[in-house]
């Protein structure tokens, strides 16, 4: 092994050894998942550096050598820093023979407000290109989902006052009551989903339900759009209301059809399993089936076990208080219905 004199904590060294054993022994594959869910991202980054120092091999290359198929793709995503993962997903979706519209929708419509600037900056550093320009150039503005993600990629979320909320309440009601998809009404939805803060959107949600006999904004979105447009606007609605809702919705869509969409399962899981502690609860509440039962039906082997395990609520252990550098906005999301 390379660089045997490399100094590191016993804890990190033990994690590296556990990764090596899990890759080499198929019966220990789920240890890779336990590591990902049990340590915060900054400690995983430290582990990757230690892994290279001890073994002389990049962790990504080692994982690719020993793992395969959907499980390999999932683990590779889990061990990447979140900002890097988001940038790589966007880059992969916009380069090549065609645009991966589903990936762009999943990523850009489920990024937290405090992350947007960091993602824009990192994307430029990695690829010497503007995130907004890339998305706009690749997707155009012909489709409503494209207009929405363009607005999210280039816009900012700004707090509203009570008067602005009341004005938008009128506009939203008009959009829902209007038959057919009209330009002005679509613009209203896009502006709200792309520029509202979560707190203001929840307030608008409550105001709408109170004023219109319990009617739901989400039902209005469902009646308004179809296909990928419907998915995108529902996802934007759910993520603003509670990321747990968005995760459960997206996972349910990934399970639908003749075969599960493992690409969507992987990216939604890797992006949100840490923060969305209420996903399984919400899934059962809305879709009427336990999440683990659906996984057992749709997914096979260690891959299915990994997906189930990652969405199980867990308290991430911090080795020291110095490892926690976030403020309230970075704390794990809890379900609020």
Swiss-Prot record:
Q: SUPFAM superfamilies from the xrefs? A: Annexin
Where would I find the Annexin repeats?
10-80, 81-154, 161-238, 242-312
One GO molecular-function entry: phosphatidylserine binding
Q: Return one Gene Ontology term, BP aspect.
A: cell projection organization
Q: Does the keyword field hold Acyltransferase?
A: no
Cross-referenced Pfam families = Annexin, ANXE1_4th
Give a yes or no for keyword Repeat in this entry: yes
Q: Which GO terms describe its cellular component?
A: cytoplasm; motile cilium; plasma membrane
Keyword list, A-Z: Annexin, Calcium, Calcium/phospholipid-binding, Cell projection, Cilium, Cilium biogenesis/degradation, Flagellum, Repeat
Spell out the InterPro entries in the cross-references: Annexin (IPR001464), Annexin_repeat (IPR018502), Annexin_sf (IPR037104)
| Annotated compartments | Cell projection, Cilium, Flagellum
Q: Which family does it belong to?
A: Belongs to the annexin family.
Function summary: May function as a calcium-regulated structural element linking phospholipid bilayer and underlying axoneme.
* Record comment regarding domains: A pair of annexin repeats may form one binding site for calcium and phospholipid.
Name assigned to this protein: Annexin E1
Upper lineage is: Eukaryota, Metamonada, Diplomonadida, Hexamitidae, Giardiinae
């Amino acid at each position: 092994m390379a660089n045997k004199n490399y100094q590191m904590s016993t804890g990190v060294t033990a994690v590296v050894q556990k990764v090596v054993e899990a890759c080499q022994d198929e019966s220990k594959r789920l240890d890779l998942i336990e590591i990902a869910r049990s340590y915060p991202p900054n400690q995983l980054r430290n582990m990757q550096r230690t892994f290279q120092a001890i073994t002389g091999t990049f962790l990504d290359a080692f994982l690719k050598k020993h793992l395969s198929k959907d499980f390999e793709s999932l683990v590779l995503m889990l061990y990447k820093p979140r900002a890097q993962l988001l940038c790589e997903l966007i880059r992969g979706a916009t380069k090549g023979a065609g645009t991966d519209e589903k990936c762009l929708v999943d990523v850009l419509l489920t990024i937290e407000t405090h992350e947007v600037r960091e993602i824009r900056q990192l994307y430029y550093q990695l690829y010497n290109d503007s995130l907004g320009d890339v998305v706009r150039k690749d997707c155009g503005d012909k489709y409503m989902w494209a207009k929405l993600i363009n607005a999210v990629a280039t816009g900012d979320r700004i707090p509203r006052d009570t008067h602005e909320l009341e004005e938008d309440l009128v506009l939203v009601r008009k959009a829902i009551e209007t038959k057919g998809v009209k330009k002005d009404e679509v613009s209203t939805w896009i502006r709200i989903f792309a520029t509202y803060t979560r707190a203001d959107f929840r307030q608008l949600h409550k105001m709408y339900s109170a004023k219109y006999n319990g009617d739901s904004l989400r039902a209005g979105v469902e009646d308004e759009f179809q296909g990928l447009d419907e998915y995108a606007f529902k996802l934007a609605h759910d993520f603003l209301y509670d990321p747990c809702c968005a995760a459960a919705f997206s996972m349910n869509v990934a399970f639908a059809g003749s075969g599960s969409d493992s690409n969507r399962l992987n990216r939604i899981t890797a992006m949100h399993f840490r923060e969305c502690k209420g996903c399984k609860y919400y899934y059962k509440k809305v879709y009427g089936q336990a999440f683990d039962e659906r996984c057992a039906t749709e997914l096979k082997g260690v891959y299915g076990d990994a997906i189930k395990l990652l969405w199980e609520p867990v308290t991430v252990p911090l080795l020291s208080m110095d490892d926690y550098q976030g403020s309230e906005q970075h704390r794990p999301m809890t379900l609020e219905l």
